[in-house]
Amino acid sequence: MIKVKNIPKRNRRLCGKKLRRQKREDKISHIKAAFCFLLLCINTATLSVFLIFAGIIKIILPIQSLKLLLTRFIIKVGELWIDINNLWIQFILKPRWTVEGFEEMDKKSWYLSLSNHQSWADIFIVQMITNRKVPMLKFFMKFVLIYVPVIGICWWALDMPFLKRYTKDQLERNPSLRGKDFASMKKSFKKYSLYPISVFSFTEGTRFTEQKHKDQNSPFNNLLKPKEGGLAAAISTMPRLDKI
């Protein structure tokens, strides 16, 4: 026969308080998340009008100097979008971090930026710490993302490099696809010779999870295996590269 001792009343009260506090904190977290998402949607919906309109006009205009002028305007709108996001991130989420190394960086150089990938918040974080310190980041994106409503067209207006990735099976069935991802990258990078940029790559190619780490048998403790092919292609196709 198993005997269960009664929990003292004082301990029961403490457990009850902890449980109620945890429920209250969870509720606040959910409210914060919903409010942050609402602010992000409002910010994106408002500024996307300017991005999409300027992007369409840039395609139509035949004069290169006017195209470059519109490109600079689009970048300014993109930086404003990040600034507004940074305001609510700082006020609501209150992140704390230490950032070093920007002393030797500027907005007039061409950069290739690399990072590991931990969560969906990584993009907001790198934008927050780099905005207006280096040229606006250009993220490698899968081509299918251009079809995301509103956001996809905004990314297109911001000259993000959209790449078509092919699986080994696709390449085996259709060998003519070999090298097309490299060609599309080279085409995207041509326009980057006109103004300074920071091309950004999550070199792991995907977010880190313990399962992915195990499946890859990665030699690194906290990283997935880097995808060297995309990195090598970026270095070889960038019209100019000052720093990595």
Give, region by region, the residue ranges found by the protein language model.
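N-terminal acidic, proline/glycine-rich, low-complexity intrinsically disordered segments
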Residues: 1-5
